[in-house]
Swiss-Prot record:
Substrate binds at residues 153, 296-297. It holds the Pfam family Dimerisation. It comes from Papaver somniferum (Opium poppy). Methyltransferase involved in the biosynthesis of the benzylisoquinoline alkaloid noscapine. Catalyzes the conversion of (S)-scoulerine to (S)-tetrahydrocolumbamine. Can convert (S)-tetrahydrocolumbamine to tetrahydropalmatine. Can convert (S)-norreticuline to (S)-norcodamine. Can convert (S)-reticuline to (S)-codamine. Substrate preference is (S)-scoulerine > (S)-tetrahydrocolumbamine > (S)-norreticuline > (S)-reticuline. It comes from the Eukaryota. The gene is SOMT1. Pathway: Alkaloid biosynthesis. This is Scoulerine-9-O-methyltransferase 1. Its EC number is 2.1.1.117, 2.1.1.-, 2.1.1.89. InterPro entries: COMT-like, O_MeTrfase_dom, Plant_O-MeTrfase_dimerisation, SAM-dependent_MTases_sf, WH-like_DNA-bd_sf, WH_DNA-bd_sf. It catalyses: (S)-scoulerine + S-adenosyl-L-methionine = (S)-tetrahydrocolumbamine + S-adenosyl-L-homocysteine + H(+); (S)-tetrahydrocolumbamine + S-adenosyl-L-methionine = (S)-tetrahydropalmatine + S-adenosyl-L-homocysteine + H(+); (S)-norreticuline + S-adenosyl-L-methionine = (S)-norcodamine + S-adenosyl-L-homocysteine + H(+); (S)-reticuline + S-adenosyl-L-methionine = (S)-codamine + S-adenosyl-L-homocysteine + H(+). One of its GO terms (biological process) is benzyl isoquinoline alkaloid biosynthetic process. GO terms for molecular function: (S)-scoulerine 9-O-methyltransferase activity; methyltransferase activity; O-methyltransferase activity; protein dimerization activity; tetrahydrocolumbamine 2-O-methyltransferase activity. Homodimer.
């Protein structure tokens, strides 16, 4: 199983970029031939996440894992375990074409072996590709201890409803206050989810599984829950985050607060109470509060309004915990940058004003809402816990 650092490479900074060769500053090589192949491949990079999505829907990664630890298996062996592919004699051939791109992208390992087959009565030696799991794709296999994988999170970000928003991305440049998701679907994303049960489940499932792996990292590097007696998770979805905190620290009374259509499908957890409401109208009273991946959904004005609602419901000495991927001041070709930059673009496509922020920008939000102190605690690859103290 991958480490937390490897898990947080999910937002795009892994070896998927290996398919892009070096592009020089010049448009022409020394003999005057344009680098058409390299430039054209940039436009074809969509093939990688689409191949990845198909592999997840076909359950490829779990099937490979069932062949054993460090197994190297062929497309034909994998296809033989797919019930829906048994009647397609070309299933293995098409599957191999999907998997070899994932192999070239280091999402799977790929090697070549020789085998003898009978062709027209003659034995012929052919080359066959074998595929195995890498650190990246291990995260897509359900863990034995709890069944968690990142498949649900990746299925959300590659869902057609989400992808359709990116076809309208240029409108944010051309039209003031334009939101690509709203242009594509005629509704705000949370309103859309409230009326579309399938999308509501896809969104909730994606957020829930990623919350689990994030809190495994948070628990390793943050000890601020030790002295808490109560924690209100504002915008907590179906309650996965606060349930994990209460399970780890059972003396904490947990409250999960979100919109009615979200709370209506939230499961019951020991030590957690579900409360429905609108955080922009009023936040319930609480000794401490959690905002995980909430502020990045909204513009500065809405964030300050929400934080003021939190401030009003906190006692003196109470605090709000912000959990977000933080934009580094210096950007680079690294996980810390990509873990913020890629969801930043996703937020720009989905939600009005949604964006990732630097530590100083979060500090400005806290001060504008009345908080007297901001304490950032780095966790892993750009993930931070940021404390706002009243």
């Amino acid at each position: 199983m991958a480490t937390n650092g490897e898990i947080f490479n999910t937002y795009g900074h892994n070896r998927q970029t290996a398919t892009v060769t070096k592009i020089t500053a010049s448009n022409e090589s020394s003999n005057g031939v344009c680098y058409l192949s390299e430039t054209a491949n940039l436009g074809k990079l969509i093939c990688i996440p689409m191949a990845l999505r198909a592999a997840m829907e076909l359950n490829v990664f779990q099937l490979i894992s069932k062949f054993g630890t460090d197994a190297k298996v062929s497309a034909s062996e994998i296809a033989s375990k797919m019930p829906n592919a048994k009647n397609n004699p070309e299933a293995a051939m098409y599957l191999d074409r999907i998997l070899r791109l994932l192999g070239a992208s280091s999402i799977l390992s790929v090697s070549t072996t020789k085998k003898s087959i009978n062709r027209g009565g003659d034995d012929v030696v052919v080359h066959e590709k074998l595929y195995g799991l890498t650190n990246s794709s291990c995260c897509l296999v359900p863990r034995q201890e709890d069944g968690v994988s990142l498949v649900e999170e990746l299925l959300f970000t590659s869902d057609k409803v989400v992808v359709d928003s990116f076809f309208k991305l240029k409108c944010v440049v051309e039209e003031k206050d334009s939101v690509p998701f709203e242009v594509a679907h005629g509704a705000k994303i949370f309103e859309y989810a409230a009326t579309e049960p399938r999308m509501n489940q896809v969104f909730n499932d994606g957020m829930a599984v990623f919350s689990i792996v994030v809190f495994e990292a948070v628990f390793r590097f943050y000890d601020g829950f030790l002295d808490m007696k109560e924690l209100l998770d504002v915008g907590g979805g179906i309650g996965t985050s606060v349930s994990k905190i209460v399970a780890k620290y059972p003396l904490i009374r947990g409250v999960n607060f979100d919109l009615p259509h979200v709370i209506s499908v939230a499961p019951q957890y020991p030590g957690v109470e579900h409360v429905a409401g609108d955080m922009f109208e009023e936040v319930p009273k609480g000794q401490n509060m959690l905002l995980k991946w909430v502020l990045h959904d909204w513009g500065d004005e809405r964030c300050v309004k929400l934080l003021k609602n939190c401030w009003n419901s906190l006692p003196v000495g109470g605090k709000v915990l912000i959990i977000e991927f933080v934009l580094p001041n210096e950007l680079g070709n690294n996980a810390e940058s990509f873990n913020a930059l890629i969801p930043d673009l996703l937020l720009m496509a989905l939600n009005p004003g949604g964006k990732e922020r630097t530590i100083s920008e979060y500090d400005d939000l806290g001060k504008a809402a009345g908080f007297i102190k901001t304490i950032p605690i780095p966790i892993s690859n750009g993930l931070h816990v940021i404390e706002f103290h009243k």
